[in-house]
From Swiss-Prot:
Segments traversing the membrane: 8-28
Role played: Involved in BCR (B-cell antigen receptor)-mediated signaling in B-cells and TCR (T-cell antigen receptor)-mediated T-cell signaling in T-cells. In absence of TCR signaling, may be involved in CD4-mediated inhibition of T-cell activation. Couples activation of these receptors and their associated kinases with distal intracellular events such as calcium mobilization or MAPK activation through the recruitment of PLCG2, GRB2, GRAP2, and other signaling molecules.
Spans annotated as Interaction with GRB2: 137-140
Residue ranges, annotated region (Disordered): 102-133
GO molecular function: protein kinase binding
Subunit structure and binding partners: When phosphorylated in response to TCR stimulation and/or CD4 costimulation, interacts with LCK, CSK, FYN, PTPN11/SHP2, GRB2, PIK3R1 and GRAP2. When phosphorylated in response to BCR activation, interacts with LYN, PIK3R1, PLCG2 and GRB2.
Residue numbers of Phosphoserine PTMs: S263
UniProt name for this protein: Lck-interacting transmembrane adapter 1
Source species taxonomy: Eukaryota, Metazoa, Chordata, Craniata, Vertebrata
BP GO terms, sorted: adaptive immune response; B cell receptor signaling pathway; regulation of canonical NF-kappaB signal transduction; regulation of non-canonical NF-kappaB signal transduction; regulation of phosphatidylinositol 3-kinase/protein kinase B signal transduction; regulation of release of sequestered calcium ion into cytosol; regulation of transcription by RNA polymerase II; T cell receptor signaling pathway
Residue ranges, Cytoplasmic side: 29-269
Chief place where the protein resides: membrane
Amino acid sequence: MRPPVPSAPLALWVLGCFSLLLWLWALCTACHRKRAQRQQTGLQDSLVPVEMPLLRQTHLCSLSKSDTRLHELHRGPRSSIAPRPASMDLLHPRWLEMSRGSTRSQVPNSAFPPRQLPRAPPAAPATAPSTSSEATYSNVGLAAIPRASLAASPVVWAGTQLTISCARLGPGAEYACIQKHKGTEQGCQELQQKAKVIPATQMDVLYSRVCKPKRRDPRPVTDQLNLQDGRTSLPLGSDVEYEAINLRGQDMKQGPLENVYESIKEMGL
């Protein structure tokens, strides 16, 4: 028979295996973290060498370190804002500028007067008409006339306002004025006065083509027909009168005479 195996070494073996697995897990985790850190540092190292040459390029840098320091030491007056490096002063020394300024001050002002740019004349107001030689149709007195009043009474504006503007303007602006003769103005005024004096009933009679007949004495009503003269007399009403009109001339006696009756209404009777 075999001797019994103690249980203590079996428990130690299980505990040793568990600790070994735990140590392996910690080791793998540490390696993974370290690898991730190395990758990040590698990316940073690869980006820095790319950015540094870009920053060191001369066309991207306005001032180098030496120029910036010299510019701070030899800074000009505070009014000058131009960020010019101090090394450029070697090309344009200050003593040369000072000598030029002194020579310019010594030159007499009468020999070389300062040049001035031509200035435009002040703009005239829109309401005032222009009387200069360069006056055009757009700025000669016509803009002051309102359109509504011109449409309401064109004769009055043409006779008064435009003639006044022509009188104010000089002889050089006659081409932009409207001149009216006195005869036409008088004729228009007479027509307006007559139109005001004549009543409406007389105006209707004036413009009608049928002349108003004279009032005749009442005659007896007859129904006789006179064939020799070629005229007929019919009974007359109170408001309507029939009158025979001979269309043919008196010297023409050929053929029967035609009688045409025209009704004429008396107005105002």
